[in-house]
Curated annotation (Swiss-Prot):
Organism: Gloeobacter violaceus (strain ATCC 29082 / PCC 7421)
Keywords, sorted A to Z: Ribonucleoprotein, Ribosomal protein, RNA-binding, rRNA-binding
Assembly notes: Part of the 50S ribosomal subunit. Forms a cluster with proteins L3 and L19. In the 70S ribosome, L14 and L19 interact and together make contacts with the 16S rRNA in bridges B5 and B8.
Stated name of the protein: Large ribosomal subunit protein uL14
PANTHER family: 50S/60S RIBOSOMAL PROTEIN L14/L23, LARGE RIBOSOMAL SUBUNIT PROTEIN UL14M
GO molecular function: large ribosomal subunit rRNA binding; structural constituent of ribosome
Length: 133
């Protein structure tokens, strides 16, 4: 459950280490890139898109500190309840930085990601992830 002012770790190799959520979009990726989402949602869950500020970044990499980016939430500490009764939760809140078309800006994804990303058409992130839970 991510809301404004939530801090997220970054699960890709764009150079950012930490993000600060400034807006929850909650939209999904369609065939023509990102669709407009409601800008009035309070919480973001796995698979939702947030607008965030890079709070910590490695030098000489793809993103810089204080840059405003879009990211998709891939892990949350809040438990995810599935239709079959399974409950899954992660140790951290993490996101992957994406471009305007919904494709990841990095070339690698670190750590496990939730299967719910497949339902929201983030198949590129699923294919880059080492483990899908």
């Amino acid at each position: 459950m991510i809301q404004q002012q939530s801090r997220l770790s970054v699960a890709d190799n764009t150079g950012a280490r930490e993000l600060l959520c400034i807006r929850v979009l909650g939209s999904t990726v369609g065939s023509k890139g990102l669709t407009k989402g409601g800008g009035n949602r309070r919480y973001a869950f796995v698979g939702d898109i947030v607008v965030a500020v890079v709070k910590d970044a490695a030098p000489n990499m793809g993103v810089k500190k204080s840059e405003v980016v879009r990211a998709v939430v891939v892990r949350t500490r809040q438990a995810i309840r599935r239709d079959n009764g399974m409950v899954i939760r992660f140790d951290d809140n993490a996101a992957v930085i994406i471009d305007k078309n919904g494709n990841p800006r990095g070339t690698r994804v670190f750590g496990p990601v939730a299967r719910e990303l497949r339902e929201k058409n983030f198949t590129k992130i699923i294919s880059l992830a080492p483990e899908v839970l």
